[in-house]
Curated annotation (Swiss-Prot):
Chain intervals for the UniProt region annotation (Homomultimerization): 18-26
Cellular component annotations (GO), alphabetically ordered: host cell cytoplasm; host cell nucleolus
Domain description: The RNA-binding motif binds to the RRE, a 240 bp stem-and-loop structure present in incompletely spliced viral pre-mRNAs. This region also contains the NLS which mediates nuclear localization via KPNB1 binding and, when the N-terminal sequence is present, nucleolar targeting. These overlapping functions prevent Rev bound to RRE from undesirable return to the nucleus. When Rev binds the RRE, the NLS becomes masked while the NES remains accessible. The leucine-rich NES mediates binding to human XPO1.
Described purpose of this protein according to its UniProt entry: Escorts unspliced or incompletely spliced viral pre-mRNAs (late transcripts) out of the nucleus of infected cells. These pre-mRNAs carry a recognition sequence called Rev responsive element (RRE) located in the env gene, that is not present in fully spliced viral mRNAs (early transcripts). This function is essential since most viral proteins are translated from unspliced or partially spliced pre-mRNAs which cannot exit the nucleus by the pathway used by fully processed cellular mRNAs. Rev itself is translated from a fully spliced mRNA that readily exits the nucleus.
Keyword annotations: AIDS, Host cytoplasm, Host nucleus, Host-virus interaction, Methylation, mRNA transport, Phosphoprotein, RNA-binding, Transport
Protein name in UniProt: Protein Rev
Other comments on record: The SC isolate was taken from an ARC patient in 1984 in Southern California. HIV-1 lineages are divided in three main groups, M (for Major), O (for Outlier), and N (for New, or Non-M, Non-O). The vast majority of strains found worldwide belong to the group M. Group O seems to be endemic to and largely confined to Cameroon and neighboring countries in West Central Africa, where these viruses represent a small minority of HIV-1 strains. The group N is represented by a limited number of isolates from Cameroonian persons. The group M is further subdivided in 9 clades or subtypes (A to D, F to H, J and K).
Complex formation: Homomultimer; when bound to the RRE. Multimeric assembly is essential for activity and may involve XPO1. Binds to human KPNB1, XPO1, TNPO1, RANBP5 and IPO7. Interacts with the viral Integrase. Interacts with human KHDRBS1. Interacts with human NAP1; this interaction decreases Rev multimerization and stimulates its activity. Interacts with human DEAD-box helicases DDX3 and DDX24; these interactions may serve for viral RNA export to the cytoplasm and packaging, respectively.
Residue positions of motif Nuclear localization signal and RNA-binding (RRE): 34-50
InterPro entries: REV_protein
Gene name for this UniProt entry: rev
Amino acid sequence: MAGRSGDSEEELLKTVRLIKFLYQSNPPPKPEGTRQARRNRRRRWRERQRQIRSISGWILSNYLGRLAEPVPLQLPPLERLTLDCNEDCGTSGTQGVGSPQILVESPTVLESGTKE
């Protein structure tokens, strides 16, 4: 189910538990003490978080053969994206909601430097 290329679910659950334990072993710093002490604790905490993130990525890639980050979704060019509902409107419970869109030319707001 959740595994890939023969990975067992038990192996996946073990890996997730290990990564969860790593993150739980580094709780956020307490907001007490002087400003400098709080800043130092936050800085050390962020550094440990970065180390945990890299260790988690290493565990995922070596034990499960996966990347820590998902593969980025490839989107079409912005020129091809539209918000026109006339072409392909879904009918999943949204019928009758809102009013039909009327396309109107937008006035040129900053056509000249004078106010009207």
